[in-house]
Amino acid sequence: MANTLYDRTIAFAGICQAVALVQQVAKDGHCDKDAFEASLSAILNTNPANTVGVFGREANLKLGLECLVKGIDSTPAGSDITRYIISLMALERKLSSRNDSMSQLGDRIQTAERQTEHFDLFDEQMISNLASIYLDVVSPIGPRIQVSGTPAVLQQTSSQHKVRALLLSGIRSAVLWRQVGGKRRHLIFGRKKMIEQAQILLARM
């Protein structure tokens, strides 16, 4: 995969989309269906031809690109998104430094891939399976990501499964970010360029 601004923008939009969906689910119990399906599909797409191939096509990242362009404002919702992104990227760094966990993650994702021969990926059973991968493999590495939302919604098992499956998708995009050469300095000094790239992509949708 190429280490270009385009590739980094796609990978970072993948992280943004996952956390924007986490926020939607935590607040309302449901979220943008197309974006949700694209983000979950990305988890199992482990051998793509190129970076955008992880998500199928650029249009599948519309929500993530919009989230990237809008930027992270100082509202409580914006602060939550920032916190989720920082937490996911820190978690991925810890995960990638542990070969045992990375190998376990790879095995569990392959198992989930085989399960899609019998279940639809967006079936409650499959969402629960993806959630358990996050809970068993990623979450113990810590620190835990505290999700803010509507308490009654967050108490529902289906919402918890969706949130964890989406956090796993965020980890998938954070791995991709690292694979295409994404570094912390790109977020600090190259954010403006990524926003411009995202605007170009949105304009052609």
UniProtKB/Swiss-Prot annotation:
Keywords: Cell inner membrane, Cell membrane, Cytoplasm, Membrane. It is a peripheral membrane protein. Its main location: cytoplasm. The keyword Metal-binding does not apply. It is found in: Cytoplasm; Cell inner membrane. The keyword Mitochondrion does not apply. Belongs to the HflD family. This is High frequency lysogenization protein HflD homolog. It comes from Vibrio atlanticus (strain LGP32) (Vibrio splendidus (strain Mel32)). The gene is hflD.
